[in-house]
């Protein structure tokens, strides 16, 4: 079977209409991608986070007995969406199945880590190689905030320590900590798919026996009343600020922490909230204004 992809570049205001239009014409799926390499920032309450320019891609099955007339389909779409860039391509089944896999290559992060898609061989066998299924959930090492957290973990002493990975996504940070010798990682995420992905990626790396992962309410029951030696949270500024008092309870006095998912303009606000409970020792910035805030839990009496 062949597949037909229609790519349409529209303004943010046209996205919903374009999605609905493609689905009404029989698309088996519709995906959204950034058309201008922009950072997707945290939305205000009630807003949908989208880029200014969006590539909307509809995917159609091409039945050999009754194929889609591409010219007719594009003519109809152009009548509904005049003056917008549009292109199409046809993919064979085997190309379609592997297209997303071909996008990924091993990524080196700092001096310690290689992030290696599970179907590829590590470039350096003696490095700390994190095997990953990039299709499972957010967090592959490509995003600046994930990179910053991994870089920090590589410089932080986690050996034989209890580590919390809050907002675990793919589980990449928790797996990294375990490969560096952490005694136990407690991971949590609000997304059930992330919980599953974290388990699967931990199993890929042979560290599942030292990992606990669950939804926040399950995590609360499992972890309390313990305290961790290290806490890393790669989420967004709003949730991070709301969670500051909770993180203060979860982390031991003088424990290490790192926060990411924060842009430069939000650093002052986030640091201000955390300064009540934590000593801010470092702010590291990477491309697209993404920052990492790190430091230590203040000593409590």
Curated annotation (Swiss-Prot):
Summarize where S-adenosyl-L-methionine binds, as residue positions: 146, 167, 189, 234
SUPFAM superfamilies reported for this sequence: S-adenosyl-L-methionine-dependent methyltransferases (SSF53335)
Q: Which family does it belong to?
A: Belongs to the methyltransferase superfamily. PrmA family.
Protein purpose: Methylates ribosomal protein L11.
Q: What is the lineage of its organism?
A: Bacteria, Pseudomonadati, Pseudomonadota, Gammaproteobacteria, Moraxellales
Q: Which GO terms describe its biological process?
A: methylation
Q: Name one GO cellular component term.
A: cytosol
Question: Which species is this record about?
Answer: Acinetobacter baumannii (strain SDF)
Q: Name one GO molecular function term.
A: protein-lysine N-methyltransferase activity
Which protein is depicted? Ribosomal protein L11 methyltransferase
């Amino acid at each position: 079977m062949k597949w037909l992809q229609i790519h349409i570049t529209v303004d943010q205001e046209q996205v919903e209409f374009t999605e609905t239009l493609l689905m009404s014409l029989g698309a088996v799926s519709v995906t959204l991608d950034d058309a201008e390499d922009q950072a997707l920032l945290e939305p205000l309450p009630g807003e949908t986070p989208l880029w200014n320019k969006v590539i909307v891609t509809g995917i159609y099955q091409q039945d050999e007995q009754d194929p889609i007339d591409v010219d007719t389909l594009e003519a109809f779409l152009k009548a509904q969406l005049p003056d917008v860039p549009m292109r199409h391509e046809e993919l064979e089944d085997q190309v379609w199945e592997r297209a997303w896999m071909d996008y990924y290559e091993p990524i080196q992060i700092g001096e310690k880590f290689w992030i290696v898609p599970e179907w590829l061989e590590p470039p350096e066998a003696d490095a700390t190689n994190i095997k990953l299924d990039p299709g499972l959930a957010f967090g592959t090492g490509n995003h600046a905030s994930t990179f910053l957290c991994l870089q920090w973990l590589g410089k932080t002493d986690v050996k034989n320590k209890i580590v919390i990975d809050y907002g675990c996504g793919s589980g990449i940070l928790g797996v990294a900590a375990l490969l560096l010798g952490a005694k136990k990682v407690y991971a949590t995420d609000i997304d059930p798919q992330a919980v599953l992905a974290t388990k699967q990626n931990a199993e890929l790396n042979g560290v599942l026996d030292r990992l606990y992962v669950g939804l926040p309410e399950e995590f609360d029951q499992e972890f309390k009343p313990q305290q961790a030696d290290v806490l890393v949270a790669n989420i967004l500024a709003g949730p991070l600020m709301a969670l500051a008092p909770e993180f203060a309870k979860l982390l031991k006095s003088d424990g290490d922490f790192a926060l990411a998912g924060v842009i430069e303009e939000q650093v002052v606000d986030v640091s201000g909230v955390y300064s009540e409970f934590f000593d801010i020792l470092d702010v590291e910035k990477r491309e697209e204004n993404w920052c990492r805030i790190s430091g230590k839990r203040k000593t409590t009496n």
